[in-house]
């Protein structure tokens, strides 16, 4: 009895879902317009209903509803056709919440009196929904969103055998997961690209697992369509009045409505004709818009600059006839949310009240059709993504809204034979009032189109240092072709000379800078206006990268001379020896990045004795080896502190000596709380730097170095620990050379290898360098 009640409640629930949809033609079986009912057939003829109630708030789904699971989760017995609640089972079939995808036989129906179950073959969409639901119950993620590869794919891989059995794990199975997320958006999955500013974040629209629907309860598509026709959807879509809609209405009602529209149109035409005969004049004293009069009795042509607004208070009643545009008062379209509104159009049907605007019309009414980006209707089948702020000024707006087309380009709906003659009469009468406006719009677009069709002059950019290295490598790889071409030999020698000058710290000849300097001497205005291009002064960075090849290390690269051991000429030997003469090292500083007060020291270590200190201690004690009363002085501590401006020259010198030329870490002064510098007295022996917030949930360790004479004392271990603690809750990433033994140290902290990058350091090392140029990309997941 209880099972039959439960069965009827499930059927009624499907009936309610079906009645919220609208009828449609040509849909596949199991698909209802407005709400896709995804029914996936499995091998055992069982099906799964992945539809959810669309009436809830799809923006809020943080944690799974455990109480809902306790009430709804049950298993369907194939023999007795009953639903058995999970609480009545003798053993737990699945350790995952919301998982009842089993071919189940209850203990009453089985021959041995034991419950029998067998895993059904799951589809990828079911697996993804189960994974995301269980992740939400764990409370992980960010605002209910989960990362596609790091969270969802990792969960599926962890439970692969339990969910997918012996299904073969292909090399691109994670791409299948990404495809399921994209295809199921926005019906089942919602992207977090808007909230976090980066792709790869997803969550369930309704945080409930997919429900299993056995074959006995499956409703036919025809039944769903019949029930859906009796109740329209309650999600209205605002459309523009005047657009024709498909509707199955009584022919008598259609004829009456057509007659009423025709009378309204005739009334509007009479009013316009009367206004043309009694055309007023334009008050020039209060209007700032230039007006050009063509002839008496004709509407003045209002000439507008882009972004200018007409002042309607300065226009007479004769000038208040609206342009050919939809009525400002929209009408509600109660069509199905899954059906795009019909884009066929009819002439503007205006009444006398519509001729006098109550408020200022939209600015888009006074621009050409090519400049208008939206038609006022958002396709409900798409998920609206607002364009980035920077794209507004740089180019056309890109979104899901469709471009407005001219009246002559809009596809007309097929009309009946009775409507055609009347329709042609209306069109012919409205054509006279629209022809002049369309002609002026075409004339205005012609010079703009001619201007746009002109080929743009090429804009040349200087070759970067890395591109010069690649070009020189290519020339050296084909000596035969270079020997036969004088131009190639000349280019090769020029590149070699430029490289030699960089190694020796000599200035390079730059024609653009010479011409720019000459123009600045003649007149500063010419230099500022020349081409609208701001040239970089000598010494600025020339390491350009595309978005695909962007590297965080590029921000520290400069065009300084690359000779090994080269140092700033302003750096004194005393500063390089003892760091600085700054006596105010014991004062706190304020971080410009987080506005936190940073103490003078992170840690003062009196216990660690690196090999360098042990050697110094032995040298001092050797002098007093014959003095039994000699007591050694206490050693100075190792001071861990935040980076300061006086540290930068020495750190840059060490980076250029032990890493590669052209490194300048001055940018790290903008976020000193994500740095650590180790001092012995005033000598810098180690340092580490991290770039915070390279992504929404990720930080990047850019440089970590300990002087070779101070290693194997735990200094690097504490620096890594400190940098990790500064970004609690965020992933920490880094690149490490493939031949660097420090990889073992990173693995102790939980860093995992994600990628092996070939020739990662080839961009930075000199050509003659023998260092390993490949790198591992490591990530510490939090």
Swiss-Prot record:
Localization, UniProt: Nucleus; Cytoplasm
Biased composition (Low complexity): 315-335
Residues found modified as Phosphoserine: 4, 285, 416
Cellular component GO terms held in the UniProt record: ATAC complex; cytoplasm; mitotic spindle; nucleoplasm; nucleus
Residues modified to N6-acetyllysine: 231, 292
Pfam families reported for this sequence: Acetyltransf_1
Keywords: Acetylation, Cytoplasm, Nucleus, Phosphoprotein
GO biological process: negative regulation of transcription by RNA polymerase II; regulation of cell cycle; regulation of cell division; regulation of DNA-templated transcription; regulation of embryonic development; regulation of transcription by RNA polymerase II
SUPFAM superfamilies: Acyl-CoA N-acyltransferases (Nat)
InterPro entries (alphabetical): Acyl_CoA_acyltransferase, GNAT_dom
Domain N-acetyltransferase: 638-782
Expression tissues: Expressed in skeletal muscle, heart, lung, placenta, brain, liver, pancreas and kidney. High expression in skeletal muscle and heart. Lower expression in lung.
Domain of life: Eukaryota
Ranges annotated as biased composition (Basic and acidic residues): 256-276, 405-426, 446-459
Function, as annotated: Component of the ATAC complex, a complex with histone acetyltransferase activity on histones H3 and H4. May function as a scaffold for the ATAC complex to promote ATAC complex stability. Has also weak histone acetyltransferase activity toward histone H4. Required for the normal progression through G1 and G2/M phases of the cell cycle.
Protein's name according to its UniProt entry: Cysteine-rich protein 2-binding protein
Organism: Homo sapiens
This protein's encoding gene: KAT14
């Amino acid at each position: 009895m209880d099972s039959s009640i439960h069965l009827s409640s499930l059927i009624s629930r499907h009936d309610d879902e079906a009645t919220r949809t609208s009828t449609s033609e040509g849909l596949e079986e199991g698909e209802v317009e407005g709400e896709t009912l995804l029914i996936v057939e499995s091998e055992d003829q069982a099906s799964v209903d992945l539809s959810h109630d669309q009436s809830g708030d799809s923006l809020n789904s943080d944690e799974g509803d455990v109480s809902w699971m306790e009430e709804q989760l049950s298993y369907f017995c194939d023999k007795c056709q009953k639903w058995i609640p999970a609480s009545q089972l003798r053993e737990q079939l699945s350790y995952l919440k919301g998982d009842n995808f089993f071919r189940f036989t209850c203990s009453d129906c089985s021959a041995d009196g034991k419950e029998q179950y067998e895993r059904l073959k799951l589809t990828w969409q079911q697996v993804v929904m189960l994974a995301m639901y269980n992740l939400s119950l764990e409370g992980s993620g960010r605002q209910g969103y989960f990362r596609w590869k790091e969270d969802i794919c990792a969960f599926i891989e962890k439970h692969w055998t339990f969910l997918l059995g012996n299904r073969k794990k292909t090399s691109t199975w994670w791409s299948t997961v990404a495809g399921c997320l994209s295809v199921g958006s926005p019906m089942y999955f919602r992207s977090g690209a808007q909230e976090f500013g980066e792709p790869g974040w997803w969550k369930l629209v309704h945080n409930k697992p997919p429900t299993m629907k056995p074959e006995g309860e499956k409703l036919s598509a025809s039944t769903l369509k019949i029930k859906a026709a009796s109740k329209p959807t309650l999600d209205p879509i605002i459309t523009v009045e005047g657009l024709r809609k498909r509707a199955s209405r009584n022919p008598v009602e259609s004829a009456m409505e057509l007659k009423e529209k025709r009378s309204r149109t005739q009334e509007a035409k009479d009013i316009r004709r009367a206004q043309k005969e009694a055309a007023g004049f334009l008050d020039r004293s209060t209007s700032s818009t230039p007006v050009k009069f063509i002839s008496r009795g004709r509407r003045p042509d209002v000439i507008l600059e882009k972004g200018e607004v007409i002042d309607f208070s300065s226009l007479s009643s004769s000038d208040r006839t609206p342009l050919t545009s939809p009525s400002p008062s929209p009408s509600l379209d109660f069509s199905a949310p899954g059906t795009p509104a019909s884009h066929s159009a009819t002439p503007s049907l205006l009444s006398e009240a519509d001729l006098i605007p109550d408020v200022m019309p939209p600015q888009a009414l006074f621009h050409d059709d090519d400049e208008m980006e939206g038609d006022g209707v958002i396709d409900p089948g798409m998920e609206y993504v607002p364009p980035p702020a920077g794209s507004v000024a740089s180019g056309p707006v890109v979104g899901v809204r469709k471009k407005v087309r001219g009246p002559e380009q809009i596809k007309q709906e097929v009309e009946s034979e009775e409507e055609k003659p009347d329709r042609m009469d209306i069109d012919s009468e409205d054509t006279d009032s629209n022809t002049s406006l369309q002609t002026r719009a075409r004339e205005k677009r012609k010079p703009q189109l001619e201007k746009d069709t002109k080929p743009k002059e090429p804009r040349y950019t200087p070759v970067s240092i890395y591109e010069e290295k690649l070009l020189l490598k290519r020339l050296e790889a084909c000596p035969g072709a270079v020997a036969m071409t004088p131009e190639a030999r000349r280019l090769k020698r020029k590149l070699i000379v430029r490289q030699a000058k960089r190694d020796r710290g000599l200035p390079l000849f730059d024609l653009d800078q010479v011409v720019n300097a000459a123009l600045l001497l003649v007149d500063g205005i010419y230099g500022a206006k020349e081409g609208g291009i701001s040239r970089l002064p000598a010494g600025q960075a020339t390491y350009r990268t595309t978005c695909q090849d962007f590297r965080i290390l590029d921000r520290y690269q400069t065009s300084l001379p690359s000779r090994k051991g080269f140092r700033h000429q302003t750096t004194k030997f005393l500063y390089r020896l003892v760091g600085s003469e700054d006596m105010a090292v014991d004062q706190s500083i304020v971080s410009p990045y987080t506005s936190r007060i940073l103490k003078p020291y992170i840690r003062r270590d009196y216990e660690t004795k690196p090999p360098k200190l042990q050697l110094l201690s032995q040298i001092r004690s050797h002098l007093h080896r014959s003095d039994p009363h000699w007591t050694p002085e206490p050693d100075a501590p190792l001071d861990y502190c935040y980076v300061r401006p006086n540290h930068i020259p020495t750190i840059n010198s060490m980076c250029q000596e032990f890493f590669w030329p052209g490194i300048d870490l001055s940018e790290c002064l903008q976020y000193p709380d994500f740095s650590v510098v180790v001092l012995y007295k005033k000598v810098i022996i180690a340092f580490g730097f991290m770039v915070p917030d390279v992504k929404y949930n990720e930080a990047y360790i850019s440089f970590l170095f300990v002087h070779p004479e101070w290693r194997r004392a735990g200094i690097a271990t504490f620096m890594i620990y400190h940098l990790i603690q500064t970004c609690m809750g965020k992933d920490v990433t880094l690149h490490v050379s493939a031949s660097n033994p420090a990889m073992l140290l990173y693995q102790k902290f939980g860093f995992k290898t994600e990628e092996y990058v070939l020739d990662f350091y080839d961009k930075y090392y000199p050509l003659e360098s023998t260092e390993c140029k490949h790198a591992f990309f490591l990530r510490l997941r939090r």
